[in-house]
Amino acid sequence: MKLLGISGTLVGTKTCILVEQVLVEAKRICPEVDIQLLDLKDYQVEFCDGRQQSSYNEDTQKVIELVSVADCYVIGTPIFQGSITGALKNLFDLISPQALRHKVMGFVANGGTYQHYLVIENQLKPIASFFRAFVAPGSVYAHTDHFNEKNELVDPEVRERVAQLAWEVVHMHWSLKSGGVHAHR
């Protein structure tokens, strides 16, 4: 099982920290999980303009490939202006819908306003629905106050939600792949 964590921003560190913590927890729960972090700020991803994948630059092709071959995902975004980042939306636009179909997604987000947790419900989950992906029932939203001055996640309730999300993603993936849903198709 390949679990890909996606930090869907070009700035800041809190989103990446949240995604990494879910990955680490998933590995703790299930040591055979192959975890990988895709931090969009490490790549020069071109804007999606509808051309063939092979005509994008090397970084863009690599990112598309990493997303396409993963079995399940933890996807993170900061909330800017009440929405997901343009970088994350661009990534979704680059990915073929078939690449994400019937795969499990878990979502994390962070921001400076407590009400922005609704972006997970109102934007990320509908995107997952478009891709016909399975979504973990829980999610993690962390406010700036949940981190200390060193950007370490210190809030115990948020840390518990991180652990719960990791458990849900791992167990949903294994349950779906063990024959439950796919055995009856």
UniProtKB/Swiss-Prot annotation:
Catalytic activity from the UniProt record: FADH2 + NAD(+) = FAD + NADH + 2 H(+); FADH2 + NADP(+) = FAD + NADPH + 2 H(+)
Domain of life: Bacteria
Record key words, sorted: FAD, Flavoprotein, FMN, NAD, NADP, Oxidoreductase
InterPro entries, per the entry: Flavoprotein-like_sf, FMN_Rdtase-like_dom, NAD(P)H-dep_FMN_reductase
Gene3D superfamilies referenced in this protein's UniProt entry, alphabetically: 3.40.50.360
Coiled-coil positions: none
Keyword NADP among record annotations: yes
EC number(s) on file: 1.5.1.45
GO biological process: anthranilate catabolic process; L-tryptophan catabolic process
GO molecular function: oxidoreductase activity, acting on the CH-NH group of donors, NAD or NADP as acceptor
Subunit structure: Anthranilate 3-monooxygenase consists of a reductase component (GTNG_3158) and an oxygenase component HpaH.
Xref: PANTHER family: FMN REDUCTASE (NADPH) (PTHR43408:SF2)
Record function comment: Involved in the pathway of tryptophan degradation. Reduces FAD/FMN to FADH(2)/FMNH(2), which are subsequently used for the hydroxylation of anthranilate. It can reduce either FAD or flavin mononucleotide (FMN) but prefers FAD. The enzyme has a slight preference for NADPH as acceptor.
Name of the protein this chain belongs to: NAD(P)H-dependent FAD/FMN reductase GTNG_3158
